[in-house]
UniProtKB/Swiss-Prot annotation:
Its EC number is 2.3.1.117. Its main location: cytoplasm. It holds the Pfam family Hexapep_2. This is 2,3,4,5-tetrahydropyridine-2,6-dicarboxylate N-succinyltransferase. GO terms for cellular component: cytoplasm. The keyword Zinc does not apply. One of its GO terms (molecular function) is nucleotidyltransferase activity.
Length: 275
């Protein structure tokens, strides 16, 4: 459906080092802007689940990267201050009717860049959502949360205060970080480098997970990398070295819960009863 658009972007990306705001041709500029608009509206997304597997559409990520090559910095008005950046703000032209129509609540001074999709019944406290991100319905993005470029946030997710969800642009990553539906990410936790937190998982406060973080399941003894299995309750911890001379940080799966249990038991209770 978007093959021609993809072809233009793929071709332009191969010569991206030579592209500047001054010399970007009309075809490339229009293709990139169209791709960003499709991301902004949610019509397309950088990653989606197909037949149970997450698939990254690399050409859309390339469109995001190209947008930084073709656009110059410009003055951006924002409340009582001004900004100077290449990417305009998503809500710059919204009026009350459009906010009502799209069903999004935005508390000042939450910032969302154009090219990020924010679904209905989402609440944005003072937070930051970067270009290419996808935030699905019913999600709470709490105070001082950062949702990185192209990150994928599922339905009914709670991102607690100060949570960091890593992006793909800086440093450049192959795949976006993904938080699936009905997950809870505790305050000040960080999930980065394309890690996938699968559906219904609960991450405690202050847990840091990257591709190199060992995710230890204490019930089975398994160690996972880059993926938190569905329904996991995860806390921070340590694992001893082979010679016992020291221990190193890890994330520990202390239990598994299903949707029925989550529905009956509060998040705090799940995290308190881990012994």
């Amino acid at each position: 459906m978007h093959q021609q658009l993809q072809n233009i972007i793929e071709t332009a990306f191969e010569r991206r080092a030579d592209i500047t705001p001054a010399n970007a041709d009309t075809v490339t500029r229009e293709a990139v802007n169209q791709a960003i608009n499709l991301l902004d509206s949610g019509a397309l997304r950088v990653a989606e689940k197909i037949d149970g597997q997450w698939v990254t559409h690399q050409w859309l990520k390339k469109a995001v990267l190209l947008s930084f090559r073709i656009n110059d910095n410009q003055l951006i008005e924002g409340g009582e201050t001004r900004f100077f950046d290449k990417v305009p703000m998503k809500f710059a032209d919204y009026d009350e009717a459009r906010f009502q129509r799209e069903g999004v609540r935005v508390a000042p001074p939450a910032s969302v860049r154009r090219g990020a999709y924010i679904a209905r019944n989402t609440v944005l406290m003072p937070s930051y959502v970067n270009i290419g991100a996808y935030v699905d319905e019913g999600t709470m993005v709490d105070t001082w949360v950062t949702v990185g470029s192209c990150a994928q946030i599922g339905k009914n997710v709670h991102l607690s205060g100060g949570v960091g969800i890593g992006g793909v642009l800086e440093p450049l990553q192959a795949n976006p970080t993904i938080i699936e539906d009905n997950c809870f990410i505790g305050a000040r936790s960080e999930v980065v480098e394309g890690v996938v937190v699968e559906e219904g998982s609960v991450i405690s406060m202050g847990v840091f997970i990257s591709q190199s973080t060992r995710i230890y399941d204490r019930e089975t003894g398994e160690i996972h990398y880059g993926r938190v299995p569905a329904g996991s309750v995860v806390v921070s911890g340590n694992l001893p070295s082979k010679d016992g001379s020291h221990s190193m940080y890890c994330a520990i799966i202390v239990k598994k819960v299903d949707a029925k249990t989550r529905g009956k038991v509060g998040i705090n209770e799940l995290l308190r009863s881990i012994d």
